[in-house]
Amino acid sequence: MKCNALALTALVSAVSAQAPAPPAAPVPTGYFSVISARSASPIHLLPLQARGGKFYLGGAPPSSYCPVEVVGDACPPGNTTVLVGGDKTLSMGVVVPGGQEVYIGPDGAMSYTIAHSVFVPEGSVRDQWSREAPATPTQAFGYLHFETGFVACPSAGNATDYQVFGQVDGAKFGPECLGFNMLAGTFPGSSTSLKKNTG
């Protein structure tokens, strides 16, 4: 009887060791906006803003454009930076031919392509993005990740915003720069209501 119990235990252990891991949570889809998370810091809960081809935490609203002559009164306010993707690649949530890709430049700066252009500087990182769903259905935020993490540094001459960087080889950050997480929340809108960002 002892032998059978040991054999059964060994069999159960072997089967559980072979059981496939539960599937990872699906990558969220759709449009989303981002705020920063770094408790007890000047960047905690600041919105991510796209301006002039780069990304910032806080400061002025995003730079955007809506062709009133084409869209008329349907132009949205353009005061929120909206993203889409996060399954290796990332883009701005805009309606413009070719879209606007988000990448980490060779200097580490989180950047985006200008409208109607696919140019990305040589040495940029384009495919290390991932998006994580909220841990439970009651949580409002998931995460946007860059494989090696994010850093925010005070903008030159501006105490109200911080430029966002990805931690890449060769990029140097001073002690005034802060590592942080990006909290991703679903954006209630459709692509047709989003403006293109100006460079």
Language-model segment annotations:
Residues 4-9, 81-82, 88, 192:
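Intrinsic-disorder/low-complexity peptide segments enriched for small residues
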Residues 1-21:
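Fungal secretory targeting signals
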Residues 51, 57-108:
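Short, well-structured hydrophobic secondary-structure segments
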Residues 6, 69, 78, 155-156, ...:
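General secretory precursor processing signal
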Residues 19-56, 105-199:
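Extracellular glycan/ECM-engagement signal in secreted proteins
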Residues 15-18, 37, 85-87, 93, ...:
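Compositionally biased, intrinsically disordered low-complexity segments
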Residues 10, 59, 67-69, 145, ...:
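Residue-level signal for mature regions of secreted extracellular proteins and peptides
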